[in-house]
Amino acid sequence: MKKVAVYPGTFDPITFGHIDVINKALKLFDKVIIAASDGANKNYLFNSLERVQLIKKALFVDLKFDKKKIEVISFTSLTTDLCKKYKSNIILRGLRAVSDFEYEFQLAGMNRKLNNNIETIFLMSDVENQIISSRFVKEIVRLKGDIKKFTTKSTIKSLKEKYE
């Protein structure tokens, strides 16, 4: 049986931090479902369709990832329901710093209460990616700064178009 992990997030936009976590996950799982959340309580720069396209371009065009091992979707449901749909009991989350852990710990606990078969696996970003956040990347590009150390070429192009 294939081991499938669900990696939910906003990915607004995808960064090298996210990609670092995806790389690590691909070493542990047969397939990774990258699920761009479309939660109502967030203000997104890119809508869910745009974020799915950005992720696909970053992974499959810029970085040449194996399409057979990754599926990119958007979702509006509970993450636990998404896991059920994809026959996965693994939620994958990336951690950058200790400050991320408290929120992620609570989220993992809630998901476990919703479905006691769910395990949340935390993967640490490499040191050079721990400072990267989508929020900072958007702010840097808005102020006309250089973000090539933080995300892929296609994502940079899309970000610049949004801020023109």
From Swiss-Prot:
Q: What is this protein called?
A: Phosphopantetheine adenylyltransferase
Q: Give the family from UniProt.
A: Belongs to the bacterial CoaD family.
Going by the entry's taxonomy, the superkingdom of the source organism is recorded as Bacteria
- Relate the protein's function as given in its record: Reversibly transfers an adenylyl group from ATP to 4'-phosphopantetheine, yielding dephospho-CoA (dPCoA) and pyrophosphate.
The site (Transition state stabilizer) lies at: 18
Q: Which reaction does it catalyse?
A: (R)-4'-phosphopantetheine + ATP + H(+) = 3'-dephospho-CoA + diphosphate
Q: Which SUPFAM superfamilies match?
A: Nucleotidylyl transferase (SSF52374)
Q: What GO cellular component entries does it have?
A: cytoplasm
